[in-house]
């Protein structure tokens, strides 16, 4: 009877910092942001200038987009502000 030996399997590698799950993330172009938020283009850029709206991400050249998660988080903040009784 022969003994069968197998080499030990390597320990799983755990990243030092958890990686964000970007598989569900997507870019929104300005027409989608306008439709989703109900804001005009000029209002979106004015709010960005004031630091009250998520800034756009450069896609190269003159192309920009927003992260869906950041826009929806901004919307949730506005809703939460309404529930607290003041304009967030």
Curated annotation (Swiss-Prot):
<dbReference type="GO" id="GO:0003677">
    <property type="term" value="F:DNA binding"/>
</dbReference>
<dbReference type="InterPro" id="IPR009061">
    <property type="entry name" value="DNA-bd_dom_put_sf"/>
</dbReference>
<keyword id="KW-0238">DNA-binding</keyword>
<dbReference type="InterPro" id="IPR010260">
    <property type="entry name" value="AlpA"/>
</dbReference>
<protein>
    <recommendedName>
        <fullName>Uncharacterized protein ORF88</fullName>
    </recommendedName>
</protein>
<dbReference type="InterPro" id="IPR052931">
    <property type="entry name" value="Prophage_regulatory_activator"/>
</dbReference>
<dbReference type="Pfam" id="PF05930">
    <property type="entry name" value="Phage_AlpA"/>
</dbReference>
<feature type="DNA-binding region" description="H-T-H motif">
    <location>
        <begin position="30"/>
        <end position="49"/>
    </location>
</feature>
<comment type="similarity">
    <text>To E.coli prophage CP4-57 regulatory protein alpA.</text>
</comment>
């Amino acid at each position: 009877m022969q003994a069968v030996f197998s080499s030990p399997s390597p320990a799983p590698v755990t990243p030092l910092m958890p990686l964000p799950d970007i598989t569900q993330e997507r870019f929104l172009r300005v027409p989608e942001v306008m439709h989703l938020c109900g804001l005009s283009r000029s209002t979106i850029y004015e709010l960005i200038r004031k630091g009250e709206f998520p800034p756009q991400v450069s896609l190269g050249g003159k192309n920009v987009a927003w992260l869906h998660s950041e826009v929806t988080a901004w919307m949730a903040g506005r809703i939460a502000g309404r529930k607290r009784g003041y304009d967030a």
